[in-house]
Amino acid sequence: MKLLIINNHDSFTFNLVDLIRKLNVPYDVLNVEDLKENTAENYSHILISPGPDIPRAYPQLFSMLEKYYQQKSILGVCLGHQTLCEFFGGTLYNLENVRHGQKRTLKVRSNSPLFFDLPTEFNIGLYHSWGVQEEDFPDCLEITALCDEDVVMAMQHKSLPIYSVQFHPESYMSDFGEKILRNWLAIPPTTNP
């Protein structure tokens, strides 16, 4: 197992890195602007970090996903969540109220391996101004959790090891962040480089 963390220049990225360090998993951090066509080749897992702006501001993420989405285990966080949802055909919308530094309640609604051995409700930290529309959610994806305001908070692909969370598991406001990352890394990737 080897993990590539794509740094989209969010202040939370290195909080995620600190959580990964605790898991004793070999990893590399790569700035998004340095992402090249074959960069992810020798990694089994890819973590797409939070970041500013919207997914389309990062075309290199879409190029990387086009090449590797069927070959790697992928987790998106915040911007990474939005990127994965949009890649598979989801639609973003601008939230009426920006959620920066808000604690909400996550409501798990599936047996997603990401939430294995966790309660069906727990606290999460939100830092976002965009959401993914539930109404026209891509058929190949399953919504696995909402917040207490019914905003999509987590999803998984129906047949590939691809997962994402809108909330920040690395935030001090989020319960079980380390466990969520541990659960993701325990899910077998489709290939083992």
Swiss-Prot record:
Its EC number is 4.1.3.27. Pfam families: GATase. Keywords: Amino-acid biosynthesis, Aromatic amino acid biosynthesis, Glutamine amidotransferase, Lyase, Tryptophan biosynthesis. One of its GO terms (molecular function) is 4-amino-4-deoxychorismate synthase activity. InterPro entries: Anth_synth/Amidotransfase, Class_I_gatase-like, GATASE, TrpG/PapA_dom. It catalyses: chorismate + L-glutamine = anthranilate + pyruvate + L-glutamate + H(+). Pathway: Amino-acid biosynthesis; L-tryptophan biosynthesis; L-tryptophan from chorismate: step 1/5. The active site is at 78, 168, 170. Residues 2-193 form the Glutamine amidotransferase type-1 domain. One of its GO terms (biological process) is L-tryptophan biosynthetic process. CDD domains: GATase1_Anthranilate_Synthase. NCBIfam families: PRK06895.1, trpG_papA. PANTHER family: MULTIFUNCTIONAL TRYPTOPHAN BIOSYNTHESIS PROTEIN, MULTIFUNCTIONAL TRYPTOPHAN BIOSYNTHESIS PROTEIN-RELATED. Tetramer of two components I and two components II. This is Putative anthranilate synthase component II. It comes from Haemophilus influenzae (strain ATCC 51907 / DSM 11121 / KW20 / Rd).
